[in-house]
Amino acid sequence: MQIHGSGMLMCPYFGAYVEDIDPEHINAIGGEDWFSNYYDHTDGTEKRYDNLYMNASPMLFPSSRAADVRPSAAAIEGMPNNKLDFRYVSHRIYKGKPKFDCLPYVRDELNEAETLEITVRDFSKDIEVILSLSVFEKYNAVIRNTVFLNKTGKAIWLKRAMSVTQDFPRADFDIIHFPGEWLFERQFRRETLAEGTKVVASSSGRSSHEHNPFVMLADKDATETNGEVFAVSFMYSGSFRCETNVGKVGVTRLTMGIDDTHFKYEIKDGKSFEFPEGLIVYGNRGFESVSHHLHDIIRNNIVNDNNSSVYRSVLLNSWEGCYMNFDTAKVLEIIRAAKSAGTELFVLDDGWFGKRDNDRCSLGDWYVNENKVDLKKIVDECHATGMKFGIWIEPEMGNFDSDLLRAHPEYAAVDVETDPWLSRHQVMLNFADDKVVDCIYDSLEKVLSAYDIDYVKWDHNRTLEDYFAHNLDGEHQDEFYHRNTLGYYRLAKRLTERFPNVHFQGCASGGGRFDLGTLFYFPEIWTSDENDPVQRLFIQYGTSFAYPPSVMGAHVNDCAVTGYKTKAEVALFGSYGFELDPRKLSVEEIAELNCVTEVYKKFHDEVVMDGDMYRLISPYDGKAFAINMVSKNKKKALFLMVNLLKRLRARRFVKLRGLNPELKYVNSFDNKVYSGDYYMKVGVNMSQGLNEFQSRLITLEEVK
């Protein structure tokens, strides 16, 4: 970090540890920049800052409209001159890191981080920014925390809020991002950066199926195990924007923060605005090293303590088995059949509340439909089998045909006079209004208090574009997206604190809100509504670059493309369960599933929950997919290969990674014992014939 002679904050270098840094050497680009000169109004003369190039120098918190045409960190409206030009005021260093009251944050209960807190100010307006850079050395991670303070004497409007701004004195990067859609989320995409600005964004009010608030910049020749990689993740569940700008002199600026398409936030005099946190993780041993750091910081410092290492019970969800067509007798039949299939947790999905027999009514009416189900009897009998019990909710949504919106039409975040668009026949509730959040909390608190519920699936089945907040005037409508996200966090915080032993799973039509903000409150997220195992290979592969398998909901359904063995073995590398009617399973199919379920129960805690993942063959290879996971103590491992093309006569060895080279391991394929060194240098012999979409799961355990 450098305080330039101008008072501007610079970050000349970000990367592997270096003992000595020469900022002047790094900043020098040769030649002369017209924007190094400035007019000093105090004496009416032209002056020059040495070694300052406004369009090229590596700024820590780039100003707005201050001769730097690259993307800025912040922008305002409401002043006679909206230029922002921040200069250094003070700094301090302390152990630990800051927290938020209303936003998720990276936890540091053990004070492992060291924080550099810097105050900068626009002296012409008296706007201050407190920048906190918290370093977790063991994760190679820097957490950016920003507070924007208005001391101008009048209200201003914040129009841009970028939580991460990082400059690099180079332009030879590939960018890796993860576009997708419903049923095909987070697909791996690698592109070469070129001059101009590359944008990855969501403007739909949530982090979205289409893009994820996570990108990587990497050496052009970076692989899983080699090359420099810079990963940036945004801890936010609303709309986001990431811009990667390659400038005219070969420098790169990456910014990530709140999308400004529907964002303009009033900050009154004396008040502040907290930017959501952003993370930058560095690795110089390829994508694998960055993923391992991200997986560890999520498990240890983001997922809450009550759930970070809790065993994920084998789950059966009722949705694909019976949809909303059930009564008490049918549910009890399914529970008994689920038990015989090795299930440890039964989740009753949509249809248990209000008058909900179809998706056109009753969202918002969170009381049990006693004419349809005897929920107490169901819960008690489920527990009597030794299984846990869970329910589905969608707190942020409503139907016009509901008691809630008949009594309070203003709770809907729409203007009915404009013929608002519906999605799944529903509208978004106005979670920018505390009264609405309180109302939903009260009704859900009653249900969770009245029944012995172990698990809650929290869904979110539409985007927010067609919005109108009745509690906000026209001038403040563009505050809705952010206020609505804060309302989501407020309800999640209240419910998880009120019911600390209830396991919450996040969901948004599958993976439409898969982000660090959600993981702060919920220890797992439903990865995708797509359960086809071949499609899931691509989805879970892409997701794994940023998120550990322990937070990925991964289930088996009854699609006809592959057998249950392949489905179950793919789902094993996540929070495992079933989406089917267990009454329809044959004895042979139950036996096939039970074989994989037993592996899950034996290996999940040490290997999948807490272990390290190694991506061996990408599904984009087109021929096969392979991964292995290894426990932290290196004593257990799982290996999975899925064939994508029929190969009957091919010599094929897959080299594992992450084992202890000196330990001996017995494998479950042929019961032979080899050293970790052998498995990693020679590999597992996968030369036997496999048809397309057939899989091979092999366990490895230490032998002495």
Task: Give the role of each language-model region.
Residues 39, 49, 53-97, 222-238, ...:
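Glycine-rich, aromatic-flanked loop segments that form ligand/cofactor-binding clefts
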Residues 399, 403-438, 482-584:
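Glycan-recognition surfaces
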Residues 307-442, 455:
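Aromatic-lined carbohydrate-binding/catalytic grooves of carbohydrate-active enzymes
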Residues 215, 224, 618-660:
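Carbohydrate-binding surface patches
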Residues 146, 270, 382, 504, ...:
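Conserved, mostly hydrophobic/aromatic
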Residues 645-704:
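C-terminal beta-sandwich/jelly-roll accessory domains of carbohydrate-active enzymes
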Residues 88, 265-284, 693-700:
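Short Pro-Gly-centered flexible turn/kink motifs
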Residues 5-245, 261, 664, 668-670:
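Polysaccharide-binding surfaces and accessory modules of carbohydrate-active proteins
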